Amino acid sequence: MITTMNEHQKIPIYTNDSSLNIYQNELMNLLAFLKEVHPTFLIDKSLDERISLMATDICNQLSDKVQWNLSKFQVWLNRLLVELQDAHSYIPLESSTLYPFIIRFWEGEFYIHSTIPSQKDTLGKVITHIANQEISFIHKQLSQWVPSENPIKSGISGSYFLNNPSFLEAIGISSSKGMLPMTFKDGSQATFLLEEKPQEMMTFSSVSHQITSPKNVPFHYQIVNDICYFQFNAMIDRLSYQIGCQLMGEKTEENILASLPNFEEFLKTMYAEIAEKQIQTLVIDMRYNGGGNSLLGDILLETLLPEHIAFRAYQSFVRISNYLKETYSYYSTIATGNNQLANTDTLPDIKEWKTRKKSGCRFNGEVIFIQGQNTFSSANYLLTTIKDNRLFPIIGSNTSQRPTCFGDVIPVLLPFTRTKAYISHSHFKRPDSDLDYETTLHPDIFISNSIEEKSKGKDACWDWILSKTL
């Protein structure tokens, strides 16, 4: 998986029918674009008819434009995208009117993450009901309205939309005169009022774990007694940026390049200190890693495995559509039809990857990986490779993504409403194809923290590691 464009590009206008309103035309434009670029239409031949019927039904509902606004329209576009069964392809919702809270999902529970000062007593509280609907019912509804691949992802992504009145209406939650009641696990209740101009919010403050609390950097490490703790938060560095520029046919910007860390230099520094202090245990924490460029995972494995070891790798396929050829100069000369998936093994190597010199550093001690609900995309890709080949033990909780999945998103703009969308153009098959049916990556040892434990600074995974290594 490769992180590509950051700027949203307009999709072509496929439909501009004067008999249709702006939302109807926009819906049909998105449908046509999906059929041109998304690989699932080449894998599931029955999808074309199913999604076309759904689009027709939505289009009929859109005929009364007075009943619709942009936010409600975007909610229904996501309903269409659910049919792709692809957590990478989604549309962020826009709304100027929101309820004054932010909800987050953590290990099966929804809680108040942020709210206005007058509701500060609700911060951190676990929700049991919203407007008399049980949270378990709401969670099930999210999978029908939020692009996802399992209930963990629908909970994570859907929690971002639960302050949006258009989204709440779609999933069957109604409010009276803009008042939304909520009940919490401790038996308390609160009512939130709809606001056009959101006030400044307070955020739930939990106790930070001394070692494992997330740092705002792509990667960092520290030596703790006889353990090297390596927090791997994002698969982005100078090399991945250069590769992205080559794919787009753009020049690298020196100020951006200089601001990014060098992953291989980071590993050299870390391994040098490990050798100096004779550290025998390396813990690699990927619980906060939402992905990036999977090549950083390849670089990491080079330093952890014997040089000539053979293991099963992912099979990666890209749908080289006409749109992709026009947008990415790398694909412009590849002679592959729009209705074919190209195996990436048959494509030419990116110059920066082909010419890189391997660091030559290697760690030969015990390695333990940690995963969690927010391990996603290229991070999930790396850990699935490790799991399917039984390379290293993995502890933690289940991830929010299928190991066999879609990805490599194209950020786009719909032409009439300028709605932003992210659409996948690649398909990834896990090394162990017998497990393609799995909707999450299971750790070897399941260890979970509740929101109550997390708020007190407890980390059950770190406690487990200490119990095994001390």
What are these regions (language model features)?
Residues 2-282, 288-290, 294-317, 325-330, ...:
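Flexible, low-complexity junctional segments that flank or bridge functional domains
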Residues 287-288, 392:
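Short glycine- and Lys/Arg-enriched binding-loop motifs that mark or flank ligand-binding interfaces
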Residues 294-455:
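Conserved acidic, small-residue-rich alpha-beta core segments centered on
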